[in-house]
């Protein structure tokens, strides 16, 4: 026998003791606050790691992930046993309600909060997504003292964490309380919210930690066990197919039941493995030679070597070749699974379902007869292995038992963005946690762009006190904004509402000279009036000079009093000696003294409402781009003020592509996009004209650098452009190809997740958000 395996089996051997209490069925002997557990002469520690997007990755990405996972398995320490566990656990309803639901605040929006909370609860009580999956790596080793064990784990856990991080999986080492919580939630299903343990208090009172986590009763029978009021069954993978698909583990754990599936791995040093395979090959060759000698003695010189001997020789040579030339390692592994149910009938039905999944992959999943207690502790992420049905595998064969499925987005304190198409879990994201919270919502007309933005606006209005500012070129947001108690400001050439394009808040420009940024803005404004690319260098210098002169007194007085207007700027241009100044003044005259002078007068709009929508539908083509620019600049003033007050600001710009049609307006937007992040604000651009958007280099840069993107149904040319720009695989592209309303991909940080959102249509909130004519008619 291989020496490493012999030593491991010897170290794992335990004295047989009959448990006299429920606590005795939990084999942990000692625990330390840092998460170190001891059982027998072994110590263990556990890492929790997040899922990655394996199921929908492209073939190349899957290969890369597979090789990365193989490297992790190859790097496992030969002096230890590693357990990879997938834990299907019920969603903790109380924690969910505390983290996700919006508490009433005693104002006019409580009705909306009640509807919104009911929608969320409906989605999580649906059986398909009432489970959450957690993944753990538990490493156990035989050491003489806890100090030796800690030194070993510091090295090994750091290596495992680094390799998981390379796969884009986030890791955290579990302390004693977290490890006990995992066991408590399994032993006492349905009582997750009651878990509480104070290790210091336990030490003071002499109370065992097992009292907190153990079930009320345990009964072990031949082929099942009863734990409290739950029925359970421990099983193991007995027969392996010659070829296993990498989706088998995911299919087994997709059953909507409380379940633990563990893969125990004992790595073998390569020199021992090679020596073992050489000895086996020598044995096979000896058998072949002896057989041929017997045939020769019978004068049968043309006999063919029997198939079974030939097969043994071929397989042994392949295994030896894997070990010596293909960078494979020999490993011993056992797959155990424990699942729970509410009744014996349900348990038997679930067992049959699991066995049929295994049979589909030509494997045999068998019940552990008279070993239910051993199977239970082997499947749990304690680090113990009491099932000796070990199977010899290479790295490649073991890596096929892939624990990854689909990435989840669940940020603490985030808001609802839909459901993960693959796992059916809620997508809860907090854009403020991203490096850059700015984003885009992209999709063809009718795909649900406006609805997506409105759903986010609704969630923010109901759950925060943040300011929400909207540029609305199509008069789509009025019902929602008014329903949320916000203010709709209609801006047009004939409207009595005016916004001064030259308003400037104290602190405008991030502590730098505010006139520099304002000069950039006025250059953008003048470019809108004279035409894209038609401003000469002389004209730019004159505009910059006049801007400084207009603001001289206002800035000197600390931005107090009456801000200058475009009419003042126009007058300043006329005072300049250059002929070019008069040309610029003439081009601006329509917007300062003429019929389109709505932005050339002092602001008379009440800007106090925290939810404000600027309806610019009636601005007309001449004023539309300029109007969007002026409103954006007024938003920058609002953000500057909110920064002083410590308040977050959310900006929504519908039909954002209009701003990229002129160089200076695109540059001003780019500057705003970069600045607002530091000011505690997030910008969101919406457009169906992705092709137009990508014509601008500035827009491409902004899109590529945005940490948050919602991609709904896309036109074919737009899909290809987005795939190139964002490195989206063909599999992922299928989620934005000819899909229904409210379906697509959401990019949040490094995660790209397919989502769907079926918002209940009977609610008052839906009626405020929808723009479908059929819904409005109803």
Model-derived features: positions:
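Hydrophobic positions on the alpha1 helix immediately C-terminal to the Walker A/P-loop
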Residues: 452
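Post-Walker A helix-loop "phosphate-sensing" segment adjacent to the P-loop in P-loop NTPases
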Residues: 459-469, 637
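Hydrophobic anchor at the beta1->P-loop junction of P-loop NTPases
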Residues: 441
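Extended, folded cores of ATP/NTP-driven motor/assembly subunits in large transport
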Residues: 1-406
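A short helix-turn-beta junction within AAA+ P-loop NTPase domains corresponding to the substrate/partner-engaging
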Residues: 485-489, 698-711
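Conserved P-loop NTPase
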Residues: 726-778
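Conserved lysine of the Walker
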Residues: 449
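P-loop NTPase motor domains
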Residues: 52, 59-78, 89, 253, ...
């Amino acid at each position: 026998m291989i020496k490493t395996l012999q030593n491991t089996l010897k170290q794992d051997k335990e004295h047989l003791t009959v448990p006299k209490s429920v606590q005795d069925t939990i084999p942990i002997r000692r625990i330390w606050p840092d998460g170190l557990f001891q059982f027998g002469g072994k110590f263990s520690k556990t890492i929790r790691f997040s899922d990655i997007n394996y199921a929908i990755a492209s073939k190349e990405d899957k290969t890369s992930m597979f090789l990365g996972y193989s490297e992790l398995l190859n790097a496992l320490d030969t002096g230890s046993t590693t357990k990879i566990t997938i834990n299907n656990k019920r969603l903790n309803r109380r924690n969910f309600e505390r983290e996700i639901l919006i508490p009433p605040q005693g104002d006019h929006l409580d009705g909306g909060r009640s509807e919104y909370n009911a929608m969320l609860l409906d989605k999580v009580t649906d059986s398909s997504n009432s489970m959450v999956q957690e993944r753990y790596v538990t490493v156990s080793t035989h050491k003489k003292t806890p100090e030796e064990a800690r030194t070993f784990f510091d090295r090994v856990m750091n290596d495992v964490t680094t390799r998981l991080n390379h796969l884009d999986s986030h890791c955290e080492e579990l302390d004693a309380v977290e490890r006990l919580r995992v066991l408590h939630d399994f032993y006492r299903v349905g009582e997750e919210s009651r878990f509480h343990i104070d290790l210091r208090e336990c030490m003071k009172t002499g109370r065992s930690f097992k009292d907190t986590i153990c079930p009320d009763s345990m009964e072990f029978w031949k082929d099942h066990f009863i734990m409290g009021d739950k029925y359970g069954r421990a099983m193991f993978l007995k027969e392996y197919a010659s070829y296993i698909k990498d989706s088998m583990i995911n299919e087994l754990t997709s059953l909507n039941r409380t379940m633990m599936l563990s893969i125990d791995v004992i790595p073998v040093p390569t020199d021992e493995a090679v020596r073992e395979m050489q000895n086996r090959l020598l044995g096979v060759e000896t058998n072949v030679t002896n057989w041929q000698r017997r045939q020769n003695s019978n004068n049968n010189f043309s006999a063919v070597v029997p198939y079974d001997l030939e097969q043994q020789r071929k397989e042994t040579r392949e295994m030896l070749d894997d070990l010596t030339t293909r960078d494979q390692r020999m490993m011993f592994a056992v797959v155990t699974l424990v699942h729970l149910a509410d009744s014996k009938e349900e348990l038997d039905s679930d067992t049959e379902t699991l066995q049929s999944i295994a049979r589909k992959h030509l494997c045999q999943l068998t019940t552990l007869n008279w070993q239910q207690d051993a199977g239970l502790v082997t499947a749990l992420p304690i680090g113990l292995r009491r099932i000796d049905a070990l199977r010899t595998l290479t790295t490649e064969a073991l890596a096929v038992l892939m624990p990854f499925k689909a990435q989840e987005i669940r940020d603490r304190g985030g808001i609802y963005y839909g459901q993960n198409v693959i796992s059916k879990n809620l997508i809860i994201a907090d854009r403020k946690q991203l490096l850059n919270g700015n984003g885009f919502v992209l999709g063809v007309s009718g795909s649900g762009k406006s609805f997506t933005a409105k759903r986010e606006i609704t969630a923010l209005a109901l759950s925060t006190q943040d300011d929400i500012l909207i540029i609305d070129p199509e008069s789509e947001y009025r019902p929602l904004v008014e329903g949320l108690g916000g203010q709709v400001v209609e801006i047009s050439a004939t409207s009595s509402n005016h916004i001064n394009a030259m308003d400037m808040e104290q602190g405008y420009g991030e502590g730098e000279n505010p006139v520099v940024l304002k000069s950039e803005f006025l250059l953008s404004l003048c470019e809108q009036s004279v035409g894209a690319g038609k401003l000469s260098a002389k004209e730019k210098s004159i505009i910059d000079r006049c801007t400084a002169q207009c603001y001289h007194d206002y800035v000197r007085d600390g931005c107090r009093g009456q801000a200058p207007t475009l009419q003042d700027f126009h007058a300043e241009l006329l005072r300049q000696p250059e002929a070019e100044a008069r040309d610029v003044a003439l081009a601006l005259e329509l917007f300062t003294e003429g019929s389109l002078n709505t932005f050339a007068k002092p602001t008379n709009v009440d800007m106090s409402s925290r939810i404000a929508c600027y309806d610019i539908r009636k601005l007309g083509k001449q004023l539309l781009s300029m109007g969007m620019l002026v409103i954006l600049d007024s938003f920058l003033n609002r953000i500057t003020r909110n920064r002083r007050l410590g308040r977050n600001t959310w900006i929504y710009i519908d039909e954002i592509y209009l701003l990229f049609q002129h160089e200076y307006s695109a540059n001003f937007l780019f500057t705003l996009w970069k600045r607002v992040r530091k000011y505690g604000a997030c910008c969101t651009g919406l457009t169906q004209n992705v092709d137009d958007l990508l014509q601008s280099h500035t827009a491409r840069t902004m899109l590529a650098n945005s940490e948050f993107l919602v991609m709904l149904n896309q036109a074919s040319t737009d899909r290809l452009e987005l795939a190139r720009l964002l490195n989206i695989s063909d599999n992922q592209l299928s989620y934005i190809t000819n899909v229904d309303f409210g379906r697509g991909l959401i990019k949040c940080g490094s995660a790209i997740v397919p989502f769907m959102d079926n918002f209940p249509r009977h609610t008052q909130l839906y009626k405020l958000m929808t723009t479908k004519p059929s819904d409005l008619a109803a």
